[in-house]
């Protein structure tokens, strides 16, 4: 099945995650290397390769292009080839989760979402709350009861309402899914939003 990009979706009719496809041939024609060189560095430099169509819908907290760092001592110690890590800790919320959630929130803004919810026990909730709060989208987070206090505090400080659930992350996910119709939130659970 085909699903239009400018419509709200969670899973496919078959209950499977949706994957976004881009017209790379069209992007190649529309975007030149010279145009890229003239743009400021950062995630949105690559906007033609991202799902947000209008610049006015971009939600940003200053995402940077995160560097690749070579670890030659570790490579020697392990006796293998080159080891390179990507330093995603430089993203605004200090986690790679910011990279995906900036897209989810920007698309949510573009599609008129006013309330987002997710199950999490940490970084994803903080990233969702930071981006959503920055553009006026209400955020509700469900965490297992044993989620470390520092994680819950970070999510709350970013502007979300947090509920602790006596159960596992799957139980939190069920609450988000079941509460969608009643609470009117968009389910931003992992693999339940395509961006």
What is the predicted role of each segment?
Residues 1-195:
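PLP-dependent amino-acid enzyme catalytic core
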């Amino acid at each position: 099945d085909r699903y239009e990009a400018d419509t709200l979706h969670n899973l496919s009719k078959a209950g499977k995650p949706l994957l976004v496809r881009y017209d790379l041939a069209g992007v190649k024609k529309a975007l030149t290397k010279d145009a890229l060189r003239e743009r400021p560095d950062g995630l949105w430099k690559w906007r033609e390769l991202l799902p947000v169509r209008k610049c006015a819908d971009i939600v940003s907290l200053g995402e940077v292009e995160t560097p690749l760092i070579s670890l030659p001592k570790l490579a020697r110690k392990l006796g293998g080839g080159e080891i390179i890590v990507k330093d995603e800790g430089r993203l605004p919320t200090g986690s790679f989760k910011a990279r995906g959630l900036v897209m989810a929130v920007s698309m949510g803004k573009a599609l008129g979402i006013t309330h987002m919810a997710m199950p999490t026990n940490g970084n994803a909730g903080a990233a969702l709350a930071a981006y959503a709060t920055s553009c006026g989208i209400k955020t509700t987070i469900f965490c297992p009861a044993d989620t470390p206090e520092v994680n819950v505090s970070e999510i709350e400080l970013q502007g979300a309402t947090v509920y602790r659930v006596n159960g596992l992350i799957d139980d939190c996910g069920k609450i988000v899914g079941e509460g969608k119709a009643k609470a009117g939130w968009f389910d931003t659970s992992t693999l339940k939003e395509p961006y």
